[in-house]
A protein has these predicted regions:
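Small beta-barrel nucleic-acid-binding modules, primarily SNase/OB-fold domains
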Residues: 1-190
Length: 190
């Protein structure tokens, strides 16, 4: 009985080996490059994309290698709306950073939100733009979604907001800036 198992295993291995093609001199080898979608242990995917439009300080449109366009929301932050105080400033700050890298960024994401937007981290030349929006006083930490951040980002984001508040950076120069959630409640979309 053991002999049959061993013979079966050998036959299986032999069938796999027979299917392997070894290049020989003069054989033409074609290299096929396809975009690789990398997924980390915690379920986050990484993709290189181009930002095609900045909507506000926490939402952009992106286009991937295949030309597919999607709305992308910066995870863990809530920036002022465009018509809200500091809204235009927040969007312009994000746009200036993106101009410096010709709008080429990496997105690190795991899911979509209830509005169909991809939600994740925007990275330009290794710089976390979500974190930068907080550090420069152009966004709040969106505390409702801290659990969705990558490990380690929660503390960085919280400390960045504390520092921006303490040093009255950006919107924190205002003694009483209005949280975007409150502003949206007072100004519902039709």
């Amino acid at each position: 009985r053991n002999i049959l198992l061993v013979l079966g295993a050998i036959a299986l291995i032999a069938s796999y080996i027979a299917d392997i093609r070894v290049p020989h001199p003069g054989m033409e080898i074609q290299e096929v490059r396809q975009p690789v979608e990398r997924t980390s242990k915690d379920g986050f995917q990484k993709r290189n994309v181009i930002v095609t439009q900045v909507i506000d300080g926490d939402t952009v449109f992106i286009k991937d290698d295949e030309g597919k366009e999607a709305s992308f929301h910066l995870l863990g932050i809530d920036a002022p709306e465009r018509k809200q105080a500091y809204g235009a400033q927040s969007a312009e700050h994000l746009k200036r950073i993106l101009e410096d890298v010709d709008y080429h960024v990496q997105v690190i994401f795991r899911s979509k939100d209830q509005y169909g937007r991809i939600v994740g981290k925007l990275v330009a030349d290794g710089k976390d733009l979500n974190l930068d929006q907080i550090k420069t006083g152009n966004a709040w930490v969106y505390k409702n979604y801290l659990r969705d951040l990558q490990p380690g980002d929660k503390n960085l984001y919280m400390k960045a907001e504390e520092n921006a508040r303490a040093n009255r950076i950006g919107l924190w120069a205002d003694p009483n800036p209005q949280n975007p959630r409150e502003w949206r409640r007072e100004h519902p979309r039709n």
